Each structure stands twice: as C-alpha cells, then as structure tokens.
From Swiss-Prot:
Official protein name in the record: Acyl-CoA-binding domain-containing protein 7
Source species taxonomy: Eukaryota, Metazoa, Chordata, Craniata, Vertebrata
PROSITE patterns membership: ACB_2
Function: Binds medium- and long-chain acyl-CoA esters.
Superkingdom, taxonomy of origin: Eukaryota
Domain ACB: 3-88
Entry keywords, A to Z: Lipid-binding
Any one GO MF annotation of this record: fatty-acyl-CoA binding
InterPro entries hit by this protein: Acyl-CoA-binding_protein (IPR000582), Acyl-CoA-binding_sf (IPR035984), FERM/acyl-CoA-bd_prot_sf (IPR014352)
Amino acid sequence: MALQADFDRAAEDVRKLKARPDDGELKELYGLYKQAIVGDINIACPGMLDLKGKAKWEAWNLKKGLSTEDATSAYISKAKELIEKYGI
C-alpha cells in the first residue's frame, strides 16, 4: 500500500513542477505511468498523422512487459528526479 501512496503523491507532485520537462522526459514519465496503471499496451497504434498520439503510444509500448510494481517504482524514481531537477 505504501508503494501506491508514494505513486499517487509522485503523480500529484509532478504536475506542480516549476518548469516543463523536455519531451523525452515527459514521454518516459507517460510510458511508466500508463504501464503502472493499465499494464501492457492494449490499444492500436494511432495513425501517422496523429503525431502526439503516436509518440505517447510508442512511449507506453516501450514499457511493455514491465511489471506493475516495477513500473510504479520506476515512475516514482523518475518523478523524484524531475522534482529535484525542476522543483515544485
């Protein structure tokens, strides 16, 4: 339960960052978040004209096979790294 509470707190805190992380950091965070919440990707890849949707899909797809616990822990670590880098 403590892991879930830490995850929820990290997800909340990362929304309060003073500066916007770069696209690579955001995609990494998104992929870990979706893997932690949903698990392996379960939607079709968006069309090639949906650049934002495709980038998000690819970020999530890269995390395929990662367990929920591992994705949750990795998300918390990445969020802490971004909080240290950008501040809240």
